A protein has these predicted regions:
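Bacterial Sec-dependent N-terminal signal peptides
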Residues: 1-26
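Non-catalytic cap/lid and distal C-terminal segments of serine-dependent acyl enzymes
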Residues: 24-289
Length: 289
């Protein structure tokens, strides 16, 4: 009898151990797809939650955008997305989700369309990248199960994409968002520091079509408020003023949003601390209230 019991216990332990070993998250940081819109190959990275390979269910998705000078590996290498997402899911603060990190390291202002330069990155994102990853991976369809976040330049992209397509995102969480000025001359001077050249007309069109302060003036309040907003910037960040003005503009417009200012600057230490809060915030939208 003891031998039978011992054998049964060992069998159960083996099954449990196997499940623990197999139920691990995975990150793929060098995935590729061909873009007809951009006429080039583009890279992206994906985080798959721990139970992805042991289940058959579909998952919500977070699009996570990097900043200027980084690529699709930034959030993996410096942002420690795997470790942070694993811990948030394990602790029950975040629901299991797929995280998609595109590469916008293109030598241009990454996330925007620039028609005069025949550069249509935003079209690529919505018309090629999103349909590709959402068909390749088991991602739940619909606005309710889709969120977007990003840091610095990616924070600016987060704002613009969510405002351009409020029908697609349930939540948007810009971190230390690089919004810049709405003034054309000031914006031209600012962007020269990064070695990027624009004509005055190009900058004028870019600001009119993409700057969040300009976009919210044209939009219906109901469309903007169909998105849950989380704005976060450190008190020592050089973009603190821009983000504060964004918060004020949102408040004056009547846009419901969370605004967080914590101790910190424009660096990965701050964004690593922000990511668990973002995962928790978007997860609340993925669940039913």
């Amino acid at each position: 009898m003891n031998r039978i019991i011992r054998s049964s216990i060992i069998s159960v332990l083996l099954v449990l151990t196997t499940n623990i070993i197999t139920a691990q998250s995975k990150v793929f940081d060098n995935l590729k797809m061909e873009s007809k819109i951009l006429k080039m190959e583009r890279k992206f990275a994906v985080y798959l939650p721990p139970d992805y390979e042991t289940s058959s269910r579909s998952y919500p998705v977070l699009y996570l955008l990097h900043g200027l000078g980084d690529d699709q590996t930034g959030w993996i290498q410096y942002g420690e997305v795997k470790k942070i997402a694993d811990n948030s899911i394990k602790n029950g603060d975040a629901t299991p989700m797929i995280i998609v990190m595109p590469d916008a390291n293109t030598g241009r202002v990454g996330y925007f369309n620039i028609p005069s330069q025949r550069w249509m990155y935003e079209d690529f994102f919505f018309e090629e990248l999103m349909p590709y990853v959402e068909s390749k991976y088991r991602i739940k369809s619909g606005k309710r199960f889709r969120a977007i976040s990003g840091l610095s330049m990616g924070g600016g992209g987060t704002l613009t994409y969510a405002l351009h397509r409020p029908d697609l995102f349930s939540a948007a969480a810009p971190l230390s968002a690089g919004t810049g000025s709405t003034d054309v001359e000031e914006s031209l001077e600012r962007i020269k520091r990064y070695g990027i050249e624009f004509t005055r007309e190009e900058m004028k069109n870019l600001l009119e079509n993409n700057h969040p302060l300009n976009l919210i003036k044209k939009m219906k309040l109901s469309d903007i408020n169909s998105i849950r907003w989380y704005i976060d910037c450190g008190d020592d960040d050089y973009l603190f003023e821009d983000n504060s003005l964004l918060h004020i503009a949102f408040s004056k417009k009547g846009i419901k949003h969370e605004y967080r200012v914590r101790d910190g600057a424009h660096n990965w230490t701050y964004w690593r601390e922000s990511l668990p809060l973002v995962l928790e915030f978007v997860s609340k939208g993925f669940h039913q209230f």
